[in-house]
Amino acid sequence: MKSGIHPDYVETTVLCGCGASFTTRSTKKSGNITVEVCSQCHPFYTGKQKILDSGGRVARFEKRYGKRSK
């Protein structure tokens, strides 16, 4: 690597909105990163994920106008 052109790579504490924190390394100068969700509180990782019905609009259209026959 070329010397003098790369930012310092320091230990950084990541603070989550749920209160969890962990240490990693980053080039951010303040040494602290604040995030809204982490792996301890994100619904995908905690198993509290909601399944959304994405077919609602299509079903409503088919109900109004009927299915298209080929």
Curated annotation (Swiss-Prot):
Query: Cofactors per UniProt?
Result: Zn(2+)
Q: Among the record's GO biological process terms, what is one?
A: translation
What is a single molecular function from GO for this protein? Answer: structural constituent of ribosome
Q: Does the keyword Transmembrane apply?
A: no
> Which residue windows are coiled coil?
none
The keyword Zinc is annotated on this UniProt entry: yes
Give residues annotated as binding Zn(2+): 16, 18, 38, 41
Its function, per the record, reads: Binds the 23S rRNA.
The entry describes its oligomerization and partners as: Part of the 50S ribosomal subunit.
Name of the protein described by the UniProt record: Large ribosomal subunit protein bL31
The opening ranks of the lineage are: Bacteria, Bacillati, Actinomycetota, Actinomycetes, Mycobacteriales
Q: Corresponding gene?
A: rpmE
